[in-house]
Every structure is written in structure tokens, then in C-alpha cells.
UniProtKB/Swiss-Prot annotation:
It comes from Acidobacterium capsulatum (strain ATCC 51196 / DSM 11244 / BCRC 80197 / JCM 7670 / NBRC 15755 / NCIMB 13165 / 161). Pfam families: Ribosomal_S7. One of its GO terms (molecular function) is structural constituent of ribosome. The gene is rpsG. Keywords: Ribonucleoprotein, Ribosomal protein, RNA-binding, rRNA-binding, tRNA-binding. HAMAP family: Ribosomal_uS7_B. The keyword Transmembrane helix does not apply. This is Small ribosomal subunit protein uS7.
Length: 156
């Protein structure tokens, strides 16, 4: 246990275009090597494409995509009497959001299209419609938690 007090969470500034902290978090997680302006350029271009392809407001589709990818349960490994158990635990709201963002960014990058803008646009559109690799990851995590429901009493 750390001896020092609790570290306060940093306040995330809303982004300049949509005024949303969620967008800022997404751009920050997308950023590589401190190149925030590049990440913002990619994100806002993807949002423009998303609006054209999705037929709805881009920010609505983006929020829906993140909301759809948020996991409710996950498994954590717990060692009891020499055996390791995958114990299903509820995910706290902040971690839900960060996991959803992380999955959207990583599976967006892994897509086969050419260019990050196109990849991100299609991954967000798929997630908003309940498809895509990020949604599959969420379902896999839920399936693992469901399969290990018998060990839920090992929760701490």
C-alpha cells in the first residue's frame, strides 16, 4: 500500500470543435509520440467522413459507438489455494470508457483499409451499428465473465 495520500484525477479539457471531454480522451489515446495535432486532424477528418457515411450527426454516432463498446463485466485472475480462477467483476464507469476507447483505437488501427482516417471511420460506424472488432472484443469479455460465473463468490 502506498504511504502517500490519494492522487487527484486530472481534469480533462473539452476539445475545441465538439466541446466534449470524451473526444479529448479519444484523441489523446490515439496520439503517438506527442503528436496531438496529427491525431486531432485524423479524428476530425474521420468525423467528417462518419457524418457523410452514417447519415446522422457525427458526435451522436461517435458517442453511440463508444457506448456500445463499453463492457459491463470483465474477469480478473485470483489465486486461491494454489489454483488460479478467472473471477468476473463489474467494471467501474471510468474504466468502461477507457476500455471502449482503447479497443476502438486499437481495432481501428488493425483494420485493412488504407489510411487511418478510413480505418477509424469504418470502425466507429461498425461499432455504432453493433458490429466490428471492438464490439466482438466486448462480447468476448462478457462471454468469459459469463463462463466463469461460478467463481463470482471469490470476488474481493
Amino acid at each position: 500500500m502506498p504511504r502517500k495520500g490519494h492522487i487527484a484525477k486530472r481534469e480533462v479539457a473539452p476539445d475545441p470543435v465538439y466541446g466534449s471531454t470524451l473526444v479529448t480522451k479519444f484523441v489523446n489515446s490515439m496520439m503517438w509520440g506527442g503528436k496531438k495535432s496529427t491525431a486531432q486532424g485524423i479524428f476530425y477528418s474521420a468525423m467528417t467522413n462518419l457524418e457523410q457515411k452514417g447519415g446522422d450527426e457525427a458526435i451522436k454516432l461517435f458517442k453511440k459507438a463508444v457506448e456500445n463498446c463499453k463492457p459491463l463485466l470483465e474477469v480478473k485472475t485470483r489465486r486461491v489455494g494454489g489454483a488460479n480462477y478467472q473471477v468476473p467483476v463489474e467494471v467501474n464507469p471510468e474504466r468502461r470508457t477507457s476500455l471502449a476507447i482503447r479497443w476502438l483505437v486499437s481495432y481501428g488501427r488493425a483494420r485493412g483499409e488504407k489510411g487511418m482516417i478510413e480505418k477509424l471511420t469504418n470502425e466507429l460506424l461498425d461499432a455504432a451499428n453493433g458490429r466490428g472488432a471492438a464490439m466482438k472484443k466486448k462480447e468476448d469479455v462478457h462471454r468469459m465473465a459469463e463462463a466463469n460465473k461460478a467463481f463470482a463468490h471469490y470476488r474481493w
